[in-house]
Amino acid sequence: MNRKGGLFSSQERVKQYVSHTDAAAAKQIQTILSSSLRKAAGKPIVVVCIGTDRSTGDSLGPLVGMKLKQMQLTRFHVYGTLSDPVHAVNMKDKINDIHKLHKNPFVIAVDACLGRVKSVGSFQIGDGPLKPGAGVQKDLPEVGDLHINGIVNVSGFMEYFVLQNTRLNLVMNMANVLAEGLSLTDRTEWRQERLNPLQRLTGRI
């Protein structure tokens, strides 16, 4: 879990928000991701789903990873599931392993975070890395060329307690929507590579 506010100190990056309750949320996520993935031409795409099922709010990432594994994606490589999570204890080793297995990967980092009341239930998507653990005072390496934060509860007070007491129903619903959005993106990327491999490699799509 990371802290939504104050994540980027030196240069604020543009972020886009999608509510998980929007009927077109999965398609909106796909549209945003496909646009950002133009810069990943020719690179392996890795989705790192960060979190642990020991905390309800922090289980968003592993739930998304589990669902993506079940969907058997074609283009994306997925790390971080309920059975094999990427969390504070193993984070550095997992990231090192990913870079050994995939040459110069483009990494999409997925994590839960806390935010404003009006943003709870929304996804925040932006370029650049996220810093896992920042919301609960843990010093972990930054992860990702692109990040997706799922805002699962309200920040500002007793954040460990808030994360532990996040509603599972909300987290499950958000995981379903985000997994579908990533799956749509995977299928879109795969089709584009098959139909126009030369254009895709030159970044024209």
Curated annotation (Swiss-Prot):
InterPro entries: Pept_HybD-like_dom_sf (IPR023430), YyaC (IPR009665). Pfam families: DUF1256. This is Uncharacterized protein YyaC. The lineage of its organism: Bacteria, Bacillati, Bacillota, Bacilli, Bacillales. The gene is yyaC.
